[in-house]
């Protein structure tokens, strides 16, 4: 079972792949898809889509775990995040992956035991929970690993 964790964003999208073999978790890969705010939005979304598609084709995940969005006080920011999620969900649908959505507090509680944990705490815990993640320093990638971990430990496969 391979889960693709996705921390959706328009500027810095984090992704990570974690596999589960019997009861053992294995980190496979992670990365950040960066787009520039000065580029046109349709080009940014196309870049996210094509880059994430390469990840899906290379690793063949079974499931995509994506963070649910919350409504930001800045409606433009929320709308742009919605665009990114739409592009991601379209790709997930195109490759017929099972999709799971998790609230940020659920992910934090699953990984750290505390639903309001800081990014540093998530980063610290994933390094202790999943072998091979000790070189991750980026919070976007750490969040994506945490999403994949949450999927693997809370769902029955």
From Swiss-Prot:
> Could you tell me what the cofactor note in this record states?
Binds 2 Mg(2+) ion per subunit.
User: How is this protein annotated for GO cellular component?
Assistant: cytoplasm; Holliday junction resolvase complex
Q: Which SUPFAM superfamilies match?
A: Ribonuclease H-like (SSF53098)
Q: What class of enzyme is it?
A: hydrolase
Per the record, a Pfam family?
RuvC
Q: Which residues bind Mg(2+) 2?
A: 67
Q: Tell whether DNA-binding is among the UniProt keywords.
A: yes
Q: Which reaction does it catalyse?
A: Endonucleolytic cleavage at a junction such as a reciprocal single-stranded crossover between two homologous DNA duplexes (Holliday junction)
Its cofactor is: Mg(2+)
| Localization per Swiss-Prot or TrEMBL | Cytoplasm
Catalytic residues (positions): 7, 67, 140
Q: Which cysteines are joined by disulfide bonds?
A: none
Q: List residues binding Mg(2+) 1.
A: 7, 140
The protein's matches in NCBIfam families, at most eight in alphabetical order, are given as: ruvC
Function comment:
The RuvA-RuvB-RuvC complex processes Holliday junction (HJ) DNA during genetic recombination and DNA repair. Endonuclease that resolves HJ intermediates. Cleaves cruciform DNA by making single-stranded nicks across the HJ at symmetrical positions within the homologous arms, yielding a 5'-phosphate and a 3'-hydroxyl group; requires a central core of homology in the junction. The consensus cleavage sequence is 5'-(A/T)TT(C/G)-3'. Cleavage occurs on the 3'-side of the TT dinucleotide at the point of strand exchange.
User: Could you give the subunit structure recorded for this chain?
Assistant: Homodimer which binds Holliday junction (HJ) DNA. The HJ becomes 2-fold symmetrical on binding to RuvC with unstacked arms; it has a different conformation from HJ DNA in complex with RuvA. In the full resolvosome a probable DNA-RuvA(4)-RuvB(12)-RuvC(2) complex forms which resolves the HJ.
Q: What is this protein called?
A: Crossover junction endodeoxyribonuclease RuvC
Organism per entry: Rickettsia typhi (strain ATCC VR-144 / Wilmington)
């Amino acid at each position: 079972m391979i889960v693709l964790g996705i921390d959706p964003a328009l500027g810095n999208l984090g992704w990570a792949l974690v596999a589960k073999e019997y009861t053992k978790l294995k980190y496979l890969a992670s990365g950040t898809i960066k787009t520039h705010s000065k580029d046109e939005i349709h080009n940014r979304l196309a870049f996210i889509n094509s880059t994430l598609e390469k990840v899906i084709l290379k690793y063949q995940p079974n499931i995509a775990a994506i963070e649910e969005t919350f409504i930001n006080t800045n409606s433009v920011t929320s709308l742009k995040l919605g665009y990114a999620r739409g592009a991601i969900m379209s790709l997930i649908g195109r490759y017929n992956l099972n999709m799971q959505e998790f609230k940020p507090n659920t992910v934090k509680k699953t990984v750290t035991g505390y639903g309001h944990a800081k990014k540093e705490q998530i980063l610290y815990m994933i390094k202790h929970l999943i072998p091979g993640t000790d070189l991750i320093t980026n919070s976007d990638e750490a969040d994506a690993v945490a999403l994949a971990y949450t999927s693997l430990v809370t769902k029955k496969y």
